[in-house]
């Protein structure tokens, strides 16, 4: 069976500001680099045979800080890029809620079928993510592989693994920056072994991970 370690990138300034960050090529903050460094220490003894990464800077920086310790080069895959937030890209969530609350609430209630204005739906994103997972399982039927990506990508991957509706990913799955999730492939399908493990972040102090705000009353972070 193959073991796949799904990593959400370290924190960025936009994450800390609760700003919609999809395809913008935002780097890690200093706190995010430290998160990636302590995560690398945790993972360095795992016999990884490959590291895959989104080409976006925040994910690639995270992947490189880990792969430097194990002597591997990240393999870039466009299917791992974050959801396209369209017209909301770069905007503060508070501003979107103030200026277009009806559109945001409709999307938030069913982010699989609906897309941000000019952006990508959860179903469209999940199709490329499932394609990546299928190719990954075929390429690495045994062994250990690291995958560094983004919040929505990882949550939609977990929805697929669990057979859960992608419409539920924002409502039911909380995923912090630099969190570790582990899935494994079996002949009969996928298993979730670990989800949103941030125990390694205790080394960088409280508040290192991005907060996840409550659903509905105060909208979830992007």
Regions found by a protein language model. Give the residues of each.
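Acidic, low-complexity terminal tails and accessory targeting/binding regions
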Residues: 2, 72, 86-97, 138, ...
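Active-site signature of alpha/beta-hydrolase-fold catalytic machinery across serine-
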Residues: 65, 156-160
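Surface-exposed helix-capping loop/turn segments at secondary-structure junctions
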Residues: 45-49, 138-145
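Short glycine/proline- and acidic residue-enriched helix-loop micro-motifs
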Residues: 103-124, 221
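Loop-to-helix element that buttresses phosphate recognition and phosphoryl-transfer chemistry
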Residues: 5-66, 115-130
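Short basic (Lys/Arg) and small-residue
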Residues: 150
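Phosphate-coordination/substrate-recognition cap region in phosphate-metabolizing enzymes
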Residues: 38-104, 221
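Short active-site segment of divalent metal-dependent hydrolases/proteases
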Residues: 12, 153-154
């Amino acid at each position: 069976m193959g073991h796949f370690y799904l990593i959400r990138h370290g924190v960025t300034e936009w994450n800390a500001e609760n700003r919609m960050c999809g395809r913008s090529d935002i780097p890690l903050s200093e706190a995010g680099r430290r998160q990636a460094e302590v995560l690398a220490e945790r993972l360095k003894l795992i016999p990884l045979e490959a590291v895959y990464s989104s080409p976006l800077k925040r994910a690639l920086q995270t992947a490189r800080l880990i792969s430097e310790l194990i002597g591997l080069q990240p393999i870039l895959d466009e299917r791992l890029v974050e959801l396209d937030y369209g017209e909301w890209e770069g905007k503060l969530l508070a501003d979107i809620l103030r200026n277009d609350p009806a559109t945001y609430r409709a999307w938030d209630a069913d982010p699989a079928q609906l897309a941000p204005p000019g952006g990508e739906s959860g179903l469209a994103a999940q199709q490329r993510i499932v394609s990546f997972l299928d190719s990954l399982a075929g390429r690495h039927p045994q062994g250990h592989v690291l995958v560094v990506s983004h919040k929505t990508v990882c949550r939609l991957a977990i929805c697929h693994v669990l057979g859960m509706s992608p419409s539920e990913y924002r409502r039911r799955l909380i995923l912090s920056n630099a969190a570790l999730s582990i899935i494994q492939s079996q002949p009969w399908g996928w298993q979730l072994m670990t989800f949103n493990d941030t125990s390694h972040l205790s080394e960088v102090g409280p508040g290192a991970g991005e907060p996840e705000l409550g659903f509905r009353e105060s909208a979830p972070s992007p």
